Amino acid sequence: MSPLTSPLVADDLEIVRRLLAHIDAGTTDDGEARREPVGNYLDPGRFADELRMLRSLPSVFIPSAAIPNPGDHVERVCFGTPLFAVRGSDRRARVFRNACRHRGMALVDGTGCSHALVCRYHGWTYRLDGTLAHVPHADAFPDLNISTRGLVEVTSSEVDGLIVVDALDPDAAQPSLRAFADDAMAALTEGSPWRDKLVPAQRLLLAESAVRNINWKVLIEQFLEGYHIRSTHRETFFPLQYDDLNVVETFGPNSRITFPYRNIERLRHRPESTWTTKQRMTFVYQLFPNAMVATFPDLVIVVVVDPIDIDHSMITTYTVATPEVAEAFLIAAAQQDGASTVPTLLERGVLEDNEMSFGVQRGLRSGANAFVEFGRHESAIGHFHATLDQRLALLTATHST
């Protein structure tokens, strides 16, 4: 596995310096412009290649906060494969293919907590480490070896607040593809720059999944630039944030985009030793291929986008917070008869982004454009697409040899 250099992104003080300089100069971080062919969003053959590529790479499965205690489990369909994660009695997180070894019944539905995993169909029972513990009327299965019929585990790692699954495609085990997957795993687990932002957020406030009639890449693009703040979020984020003012950093296939709040200017006349980014900015970490970690003053949101087909995606959002903040939110929600624990402003902002992405999806089929235009202030999107093209080319070359 190739070691990654550290630090991978600028420290908080340097980010503040760069942002204040941009405010003074009326500038933002520049990168390369890019034109992405519309056909890359609409071609079923291209989508099939992308899905094959995604299944050959490690990816973020869930935040650690989704299963904090022994027995906690949660399921998700990852690139078309039903999986679930469970925290064992040894506190280790494991990920399994979501199927009983009897008749293939999905073992876990949604979230829960239990001392054992019991199939609702015929009662086959598994320990939290996946081993098969009990089969009703086992004498009816003369060829069954209980010791070898445990759940099928998917290789995973738990690092810095995230549970990451290894490649799901069996072909990824080939030597020619293993180095490819190992480098991708390193980019998600070694020296992770989101560590200090995500690890303290140990409590899950909310987990939501929804199918959107939007291509998976369009959904990811909506997180990666601040050029739209004034137009899209005029009454939500724009009064608090700057339009078209970001710091953009890349580390391997990943990127970090910093969105400053207007109150950052209060730091100008304070000693640098007192500077803090808390309450001053949002960091969005795009973790290739399909996850985002976004920090807000009191919350962290982990978003995972699963492609379904060229026009549909499943977007799963986990909202996590520190124990102190989570307790305050839960008390407030109880006082409001179970109202959402996510601030209304943030909810409205997400709805606005989704509305714009749905509009893009509709426009892609209009025939008006041969390509989508990304400007120099949208360079994190360009980095995402360039990385995607590079990984597709590597995979194609490997399969053709």
Task: Annotate each language-model stretch with its function.
Residues 2-110, 155-157, 179:
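N-terminal pre-ligand scaffold of iron-sulfur
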Residues 3-5, 86-87, 92, 98, ...:
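C-terminal catalytic domain of Rieske-type non-heme iron oxygenases
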Residues 14-44, 105-116, 193, 235-265:
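N-terminal short leaders/motifs
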Residues 40, 45, 64-65, 71, ...:
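Solvent-exposed, flexible loop/coil residues
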Residues 55-56, 78-79, 113, 151, ...:
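Short, well-ordered loop/turn elements at secondary-structure boundaries
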Residues 56-66, 135-140, 284-289:
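Short Pro/Gly-enriched beta-strand edge/turn motifs at strand-loop
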Residues 61-69, 145-146, 280-285, 318:
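Short linear motifs in intrinsically disordered
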